[in-house]
């Protein structure tokens, strides 16, 4: 990669492009007892042409996606739905394919529907290597969420960014209200995270630093709510380089 072709990109974007970092919030479809049962039940459902929306599939998806929506990363959700990454449109294979089933909140599932295709598959693609997640400004000011492509402009990246923007800002009067609630939850999450970062940097007590480090590690792991925003907050600031050690290598 020739850096002169990417002048103006933040330091993290350049480091990703040059292979210095391997960041990914990549959800692994682990083989567990729950997923084995879900796959077996999906096979039966396919043969009987019955519903894929069954207990074992819901429980397995909840486990795989750490109980959070794969699109907005919100965990404070009361309504979840099974989402098809590639809209099945009646296609039996896509409809019952375990690898095509994702865990989504009702808000994001309704917004996505079959309007965004193709999009990145977070169980296969290093989403954070392709998209930067940033929150600019503060509440009461010109607060704005930014999703920007890192490196190659691909159709699935562009569509994913469009979906993220729609999910976080809403597309109808009702969805805009729901999106506002998601952004409020994100804001509170990031505020708490920033406080941990500040305390970690300021404390001189070794034991206290270890305790806060544990909290930071918890907030940056794959299962954390809004992990993408938190990781990019660290990656974008040189002063936080010490905290990068708590970001898991996937």
Predicted regions and their residues:
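DNA major-groove recognition helix of helix-turn-helix/homeodomain DNA-binding modules
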Residues: 108
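Histidine-centered nuclease catalytic patch
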Residues: 50, 71-103, 112-131
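C-terminal, charged low-complexity interaction regions
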Residues: 22, 160-250
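Short, charged surface segments at domain edges that flank catalytic/cofactor-binding sites
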Residues: 16-68, 90-96, 179, 191-198
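Residues that form or immediately flank small-molecule/cofactor binding pockets and catalytic motifs
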Residues: 32, 87, 136
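Short hydrophobic targeting helices and cationic amphipathic motifs
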Residues: 3-9, 14, 127
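Domain-level detector of nuclease and nuclease-like folds
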Residues: 113-200
């Amino acid at each position: 990669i020739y850096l002169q072709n990417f002048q103006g990109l933040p330091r993290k974007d350049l480091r990703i492009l040059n292979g210095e970092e391997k960041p990914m919030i990549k959800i692994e479809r682990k083989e567990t007892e729950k997923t084995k049962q879900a796959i077996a039940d999906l096979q039966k459902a396919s043969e009987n042409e019955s519903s894929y929306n069954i207990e074992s599939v819901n429980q397995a998806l909840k486990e795989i996606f750490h109980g959070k929506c794969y699109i907005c990363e919100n965990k404070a959700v009361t309504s979840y739905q099974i989402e098809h990454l590639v809209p099945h449109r009646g296609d039996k294979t896509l409809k019952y394919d375990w690898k095509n089933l994702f865990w989504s909140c009702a808000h994001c599932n309704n917004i996505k529907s079959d309007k965004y295709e193709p999009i990145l598959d977070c169980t296969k693609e290093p989403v954070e290597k392709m998209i930067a997640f940033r929150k600019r400004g503060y509440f009461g000011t010109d607060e704005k969420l930014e999703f920007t492509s890192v490196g190659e402009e691909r159709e699935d990246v562009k569509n994913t960014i469009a979906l993220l923007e729609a999910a976080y800002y809403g597309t109808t009067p009702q969805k805009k209200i729901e999106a506002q609630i998601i952004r409020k939850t994100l804001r509170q999450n990031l505020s708490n995270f920033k406080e941990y970062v500040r305390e970690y940097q300021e404390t001189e007590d070794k034991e206290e630093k270890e305790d806060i480090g544990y909290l930071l590690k918890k907030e940056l792991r794959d299962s954390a709510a809004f992990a993408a925003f938190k990781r990019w907050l660290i990656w974008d600031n040189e002063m936080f380089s010490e905290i990068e050690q708590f970001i898991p290598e996937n």
